[in-house]
Every structure is written in structure tokens, then in C-alpha cells.
Amino acid sequence: MPSAINAAVAQQTAAGSVPSTTSTTTEGTGGGTGGIYSAIISRNQPIIKVKEKTYEELHKKCLEENILYEDPDFPPNETSLFYSQKVPIKFEWKRPREICENPRFIIGGANRTDICQGELGDCWFLAAIACLTLNKKLLCRVIPHDQSFIQNYAGIFHFQFWRYGDWVDVIIDDCLPTYNNQLVFTKSSQRNEFWSALLEKAYAKLHGSYEALKGGNTTEAMEDFTGGVIEFYEIKDAPKDIYKIMKHAIARGSLMASSIDDNLGFHYGAAPRSDIGELIARMVKNLENAQMTYSTVDYQGTDERPAWTIMPMQYETRMSCGLVKGHAYSVTAVEETTYKGEKMRLVRLRNPWGQVEWNGPWSDKSEEWNFIDEEEKIRLQHKIAEDGEFWISLEDFMRHFTKLEICNLTPDTLEADKLQTWTVSVNEGRWVRGCSAGGCRNYPDTFWTNPQYRLKLLEEDDDPEDEEVICSFLVALMQKNRRKERKLGANLYTIGFAIYEVPKEMHGTKHHLQKDFFLYNASKARSKTYINMREISERFRLPPSEYVIIPSTYEPHQEGEFILRVFSEKRSLSEEVENMIEADRPSKKKKGKPIIFVSDRANSNKELTTDEDAGKDGEKTHVDEKKRSSAKAREKSEEETQFRNIFRQIAGDDMEICREELRNVLNNVVKKHKDLKTEGFELESSRSMIALMDTDGSGKINFDEFRHLWDKIKSWQKIFKHYDADHSGTINSYEMRNAVKDAGFRLNNQLYDIITMRYADKNMNIDFDSFICCFVRLDAMFRAFHAFDKDGDGIIKLNVLEWLQLTMYA
């Protein structure tokens, strides 16, 4: 059955962009960007991808076979723990039933006091969990509550996380790492409650290992729990209405966290990667010295059991006031009360350790509470307990804390949430080294090669108090998979973005803005800074118009994937800019060479002629006379005479040459161009040229075919010399984009990526041999496509035989 070769599918899958009707990308499903491009980058994957079984299917199978689930993708061994070095002690992986009697998934509802940090620097993750427990709808989405150690128990559990635009279901078994029968990592304040430990394991699986969770920003986990978008404030530079912002965030159900810089340059909860050995050493020491501590609560007749306490391994620094530097806290409430006749604004925070609290004004036992009546204490949920939660005045909060992170919920977080009015557009992209990883504006030669996204702001805000015609929107740029790739040496890139207004004459077009535009136009808005966080976001207010967003890493040549989200209060459109895929075609007065299928030559000599073959006899005669006149003029030239003599000497009487002979001819001619530094053409290059220029299937090319090839090479040679400004004999892969355009070809980013992968060396340079081979292939494949595309609609249909004939002999 013939398959349509059409560009529409791949580009819509990749970025929601409007595709070129002349693209030659085949239809495809899955695999990232789809189409031929995804077929190339995933060609080593199994031909048939078996659909993974769902939680329900696996759970049912375990019950039917009366077995406990064992996760093959996250096994109970060292590979799931640490990747940088081995742990000198042996952990035992145990199921909850082996750790304590009467284990429970959740006891009395999941709440923020259930979470106690273990021997891992993931306080950022636990602070986010504590925030999550404040929103029961979100909590039930992340932690499906229909799971139990009693009814239909099969040793299998699942949790759901937002992952770069999609919600994914992470399935795990319930084997947990222990030492001396104690959980090593996160645990509940109640010994027989395990939802927090299992949630941490699922999150570790999502990122490849427990070690991958060491160090991070709370908003990273908040986003993975909600699909929300972050706002980040340096408290010393916070707006005057910061209390109002925090109060409004709590009312909207947003998640919020805060932290204190340690003045050592560390992020909270994170040690330098080189210190993982020290982390493990301290962890071992703490585990070996850990003592069980028991509460005085009477547990008779309940499912609760005594909790143990292990002080977490820490790079954090405790202050005399009880707060901890380099540490993340959950913001669980923001309230206002009356104190001695005056309004007092308070902030409630929680330490993920489940202990170690603020001991200043408004702490659990402070004298300020003596002036608050009992009813107000109940409203504020004040209690005296070493549970890690405490109140602090807004003034002291602003004095001691340095960062505030807010994760705002988006319309797709909960379908029933009617308070949200944002419209959201999501675009996925990638920076490719040597092609579309151009770095920031400091690198003008490559900045313009970064992916570009058009933003159309169509409607102004509904704000009767604001007379300006303004559109409010938020841009969020997130880099993908960097935490999961830590074991391969990956770190977070320093990222940011800039926004430019598109000239009115270019509104509605799909053209990739070129280098000169950015040299002579200033940005209308940009991220305040480039920062090495997973996501950077910024609010903007601009007049209705058409803009282009340029996401980038700070330095060029840094390869990675990203997701760009645009949130607007009113209707807007956002899509990736993709050039229309096309090539300049020769004048219709020139008769094109027919394309002949190899298998048809011996039979019917079937031809697929170009549109130019249709013409009147008088027109043909005129063209022939013009060709003969032009040929005579060329033959008079010294180069032509020399050219024919060389060709005749090598080709012999049949005046046709094979790949070895073509190589000799080209190299003999190229040698005479002293200003072109090249070692000549490789045999494989001439083999490819023969295949692409051979129109009669003889495996050789005649003088006319060679003449056509040489004319092309001469024009391409001029382009090469123009961009080889330093006469090194190479051009860099970024310059190749302009060279391709100068040669009459217009391609999209996916095709530029492929050219870079196929023809550039490890230094992202393209030599003359590879340069010419690339252009010969582009020229031949465009001519072939146009020959098949008789109705000019940008779609051709080929059966398998035709497709293989066209692609294998090329």
C-alpha cells in the first residue's frame, strides 16, 4: 500500500507548528518529533514496541498467580541506590511486612507531619511533599488512595507525576532499603506508615536512582506533582506586596517553599557532586550509631507504632535561632492576627526533618502566644510539639530567609479547578550542538540559530483600572532530563530567553529570523538572568502584537531538550518557527533530465519526466539552439578544452566514467584551484555522486551529466570560499545554515540537525568534500521529489519497491 510522504504530522507532533506543504517528512507515530526524523534517531530501537502493562494489569496478574510484584526496571540492589560509588555497608531491601507488624499505606490521612527526612539530601523533595498534603485533590492525583497492605495486597504500588507535559504512572514494588531493620531514606513519623517512603522510591525510579535526588529546588518537585509553573523571588528584592502575593498563593492552592542561603554557594539540600563519598561515609556512621527513640504516646489499640529518629546527614548549617542554612522549608500557611491591639502578620513553616524549629518570637513556646486567646490559637492551629512546624512573624521571615518559591497551578492540573483563567501553549524543542545550540546574545554569530517561537498576543487584559492596552503573559523555559542523566555526567545548564517584536511586514510569516535582525534590533523583554535551574519563568506585560521567543543556554554548543510554556490571561498563539522546505528550481526553459527506475530500464524504460518536458516543438528548437550556442562558447574557453581533454583521457571512447575515474577527474581539476585548501575527494564521495547524477542506471556518468555536476560544484565552491574566511579548508556547522540558503535550499531545523549529524566532524566543522557531497544530495533529492510530485501539492506516493529504488541507489 503506498504511503504518503507528508510533513504535516511530524511538525505538529513536535511543536504544534504549521508545516510546510513541500516537506518530505514521512508520517510517523511517537519517537519524539515524529516522521523520518524520529525514524532516524530511533532506528536502533526494536521494530515492534510492546505496550507496557498498566498497574491494573500487573496487580491483577500478581493476585491471580498469588505472587508479590518485583520491579525489573528498578531492582532492589545497588544500581537503584548510588551510581557514583559503592556503599561500604550492605543494605537489606525489605518489604514493609518484614520491617514491622501491621504495616499501613496511609494512617488517618496523609499529612505534612508524616514526612521525616532520611539519609539523603532531598529536603527539597520532602518540602514539596509537605506542601502537597495541603491540597487533598492534588494529593489524591499523585498518590492514588485505593492502595493497601491489607485488601488485595500484591507488593505493587503506583504514583503519578507530571513529566514535561504529560502525566505518567510510575509503578514500583514495595521493597525498601533498610539497615538494622530501619528505613535508610524518607520515613513517616509513625513506624508502620509507608506512603511517604514509597512515594520517594517512585520519584527515585523516575530519575534513575536515589542518588539522583541529592540536591535540588523545591519547585522542581512541586512542578512534578502539579504540572504548575513556578515563580521565584529573592526575598531581599521582593515586591512590597509580598504578603499579599503569598496570601493569594495559599488561597489559590499554590504550593510554596522557602530557603536560607548558606553563604557557601551550595543550593539547599545539595552537596557538591565530588562530596558524594563524604555523604555516604557520614550516612554509614549515622546509621551505625542510630538509636531508636520512643514516644510516650499510648499506642494500645491503635495501628500506630513508635517512630525512630535518625538525624539526617547534612551539609546544612544550624543557626542559634533554630533555623537551618542551606535547607528547604515548606510554607504551610500565611495568616494575620491581633497582638497587643495591633495587626501581626505570621508565616507558618515546616522543616522536612520533622524536628529542629525556630526558637524566636512566635515559636511554639514563645511568650507571644500568651496574648492570644484560645479560640484564635485553635484557628491558627497552634500547638507545642517538636514536629518541625512553627510560626514566625513576616518581619523575621523576611530578615532570615533568602528565597521564596511558588508553584502556581495551571488549568490542566485539576479539571474541576474553575479559579484558573490562564490559557496555556506548550512547545517542545532541543538545542543541537553545531546546529541550533547558539548560546545567548553574547554570541551574535550563533545566537540566531537557536530555536525560535512565534507568540501572537491577540487580546488585551480585562483590567478596567488599567488604561494601557497591554497583554499579560508568563513564559516558562524548562530543560528536560538533566537530573536523570546525572550519572552520565550531566548537570543543569544555565538557561534563559529573550523576546523580540516581529516587524509588521513579517507578521503571519514562518521565516526564521536571521543574524542581521538580532544585530540591529533590541529585545522587548527577556529573563532577568540566566540561571542553572531546571526551569526559569518570568511575567511580562506587552502590547498586542507578534513576537518571537528565543530560548537558549548561556553558552553555545550545549546540547539538550527543553519545553517552552506560555501562559496568558487572554487568547494567544505560540508555535515554533519552521521555514518552508523548498529549493530554487531551474528556469522552465531548461529541459530537466528524466529520472528512470533501475528495475524498469530493461523492460519499458519507464520515465518520470519533469514539468519542463512538456513544450512545443518550436520552443524545443529554440532551447536546443541556445544550448548549442552556449556549449560552443564554453568550448572556446581554456577550461572547457582542458576539461574535455582530461575527461576523454580518463573515460576512453565511450565517454563515460565510473566512481574511480570521477574521483581522478575532480581531483585533477580541483588541484588547479590553489586558493581552495582541500585534500581532494574521497572514493565514497565520488561513489555517492555517481549514484545521485546517474540518470540512465549504467553506474557511470557521461560528459553531459558530469558537466552538469561540475557547473554545480563551481557555484557551490564560490559559496564555500565565501564562508571559509580563514582559508582553513572548512566552514563551521552554523555557517552551513547560511551556505545552504545561499545555494537555493530552504530547510527546517530538523533537516539542519540531520545535516550537522551527517556531515560535520567532531569539532563541528565541514570540509569541502563533505560540503559538496551534502549539496549534491540535496540537489538530487529535491529534483527527484519534484519529478514525482506531478500535481505540485507537496505530497508524493511511493510503494515499497519505488521507495527502496529511490533511496538505496543514492
From Swiss-Prot:
Output the SUPFAM superfamilies linked to this UniProt entry.
Calpain large subunit, middle domain (domain III), Cysteine proteinases, EF-hand
**GO terms classed as biological process:** calcium-dependent self proteolysis; cellular response to calcium ion; cellular response to salt stress; muscle structure development; myofibril assembly; negative regulation of apoptotic process; negative regulation of DNA-templated transcription; negative regulation of protein sumoylation
Pfam families named in the record: Calpain_III (PF01067), Calpain_u2 (PF16648), CAPN13-like_C_EFh (PF21875), EF-hand_1 (PF00036), Peptidase_C2 (PF00648)
Compositionally biased residues, Basic and acidic residues: 613-639
Instruction: Report residue spans for region: Disordered.
Output: 9-31, 578-639
The enzyme's first-digit EC class, named in words, is hydrolase
Q: Which cellular compartments is it found in?
A: Cytoplasm; Nucleus, Nucleolus
Annotated Low complexity bias: 9-27
Record keywords? Calcium, Cytoplasm, Hydrolase, Metal-binding, Nucleus, Protease, Repeat, Thiol protease
GO function terms (MF aspect): calcium ion binding; calcium-dependent cysteine-type endopeptidase activity; catalytic activity; ligase regulator activity; molecular adaptor activity; peptidase activity; sodium ion binding; structural constituent of muscle
Q: Which residues bind Ca(2+) 3?
A: D724, D726, S728, T730, E735
Give binding positions for Ca(2+) 2: D694, D696, S698, K700, E705
Q: Where is this region: Domain IV?
A: 639-809
Q: Which domain of life is it from?
A: Eukaryota
Give the region (Linker) as residue ranges.
Answer: 580-638
What PANTHER family does this protein map onto? CALPAIN, CALPAIN-3
Q: What is this protein called?
A: Calpain-3
Organism from which the protein derives? Gallus gallus
- Gene (UniProt): CAPN3
